[in-house]
A protein has these predicted regions:
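Short, charged, intrinsically disordered terminal tails
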Residues: 197-200
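Nucleotide and nucleotide-moiety/phosphate-recognizing core
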Residues: 2-164, 169-185, 193, 203
């Protein structure tokens, strides 16, 4: 997939990986490749309008990827999305792919998120998948930058801040299309069992 000039990306770095013994999720290696390198590698190939990783200074970001962080840190994924969108500074009509760094199966969803084009009344498209029951994956989606900016500003106006606010609570108000993906595509990494599952698939 050639990079599209109308597509940008935000990679949300995730928390401290408490259930993984405090490991830095972006630096977790699967198949000899760090998660941040694997995920950003997919996005850089598709997103010509820029890619930003919301990660602390301790994480080395791949070449061609910007870095930002919510202030203060550890504000949760919605605060990370807000920081990432501000760092990108893209026009309202740009499409912004939003993903978590612990999504090594991302390559299986990006084409379905970007094609076909969004409908005229749609504000974005998210993946639906999971095990045992599929559910909306707001951290595996593409959003119109203007709609994302508006809904975040509305949340700040209503709540005072998006720090610690759930992603689903805010983004579900958008007019979103949904595309089904295999459960494996959106399996994230929260536990040692998840790490072992991905290592069996990709190697250590």
């Amino acid at each position: 997939m050639a990079p599209r000039a109308d597509v940008a990306a935000i990679v949300v770095g995730g928390g401290g990986g408490e259930r993984l013994g405090g490991v830095s999720k972006p630096d977790l290696t699967l198949g000899g490749v760090r998660l941040i390198d694997r995920v950003c590698g997919v996005l850089v190939e598709a997103c010509g309008a820029g890619c930003v990783a919301v990660v602390p200074p301790s994480v080395r970001v791949p070449e061609g990827v910007m870095r930002t962080l919510e202030d203060p840190p550890s504000g949760g994924p919605l605060a990370g999305i807000d920081a990432g969108l501000r760092a990108l500074g893209v026009d309202d009509d740009v499409l912004v792919v939003v993903v978590s760094v612990d999504a090594p199966g991302l390559a299986g969803s990006v084409p379905a998120l970007l094609d076909p084009p969004l409908g005229p009344d749609s504000e974005g498209r998210i993946a639906v998948g999971g095990d045992p029951e599929p559910f909306d994956q707001y951290l595996m989606g593409v959003y119109r930058a203007g709609a994302l900016r508006r809904i975040l500003d509305e949340a700040v106006a209503a709540l005072g801040s998006v720090r610690g606010v759930g992603v689903r609570r805010v983004l579900r108000a958008l007019a979103l299309e949904r595309v089904s993906v295999d459960a494996d595509v959106c399996r994230d990494i929260d536990t040692p069992e998840d790490v072992a599952w991905w290592q069996d698939l990709l190697g250590k």
